[in-house]
Regions:
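Residue-level signature of catalytic and energy-coupling elements of molecular machines
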Residues: 7
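Elongated scaffold/linker segments in the mid-to-C-terminal portions of large proteins
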Residues: 15-132, 138, 142-149, 153, ...
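Short, small-residue-biased leader/transition segments that mark boundaries at the very start
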Residues: 3-4
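C-terminal functional modules
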Residues: 148, 152, 159-208
Length: 208
């Protein structure tokens, strides 16, 4: 709260233009780490798959980012994530979504360490807890908008995520005044920065 109250001396992010991100080129060694991985790392049973928790959260709420981050395998009906905490040889990968290598693992795919949306979620939590004054609902909604708009710029697959699509999604995940609603959407927005989402889970217990 002290940093927020002294923004003249401790400025905070004010737009996606302030995001702390790594930009890469298509020539080694200046490439995204995942760009050096074969496509099989994203599509096989021994590769990396999204967990059912985040896939279910996004699917049930109509989150437009789901098609930016994940891909449905051929023949799949709907979105399905993998079960967490089991060995790959014990898992059934039938119909499980793949990570979208074109957006996450291209040689030139950017990697964001901290984004504007995270700052807004932090502000929303601080307001909800009574640490600072402000409009928690506005911070929450603007955080979601900032996250989606960031990923729209990253997307190379041509998904048509209009402002109307974003506003319809916001109507599906309204802020209800609780910390849980803030952290649940922050958890989704922190996809691909998993250590931050894990830190929030350890201190808040959300998402359940």
């Amino acid at each position: 709260s002290d940093v927020y109250k002294r923004q003249g001396r401790n400025p905070v992010f004010e737009s996606n233009g302030d995001n702390a991100k790594m930009s890469y080129e298509s020539v080694e060694p200046f490439v995204n780490y995942w760009g050096t991985k074969l496509n099989t790392q994203f599509t096989t049973s021994t590769g990396r798959r999204p967990a059912e928790q985040i896939v279910d959260m996004m699917n049930h709420s109509g989150d437009p980012r789901i098609g930016i981050w994940f891909q449905q395998p051929s023949g799949a009906e709907g979105w399905k994530g993998g079960q967490s905490g089991i060995e790959s040889q014990e898992a059934d990968f039938t119909g499980i979504a793949n990570l979208n290598k074109a957006n996450l693992g291209d040689y030139a795919s950017p990697y964001a360490l901290m984004k504007y949306d995270e700052v807004l979620f932090i502000q929303a939590e601080a307001i909800q807890r009574g640490w600072i004054a402000g409009d928690a609902a506005a911070c929450y909604q603007n955080a979601i908008r900032a996250s989606i708009n960031y990923w729209k710029e990253v997307d190379t697959t041509g998904l048509n995520i209009t402002d109307k699509v974003i506003e319809n999604f916001l109507a599906n995940v309204p802020y209800d005044g609780t910390l849980e609603s803030i952290i649940n959407q922050k958890y989704v927005a922190l996809f691909w920065v998993g250590y931050e989402a894990w830190a929030d889970y350890r201190r808040t217990g959300y998402p359940v």
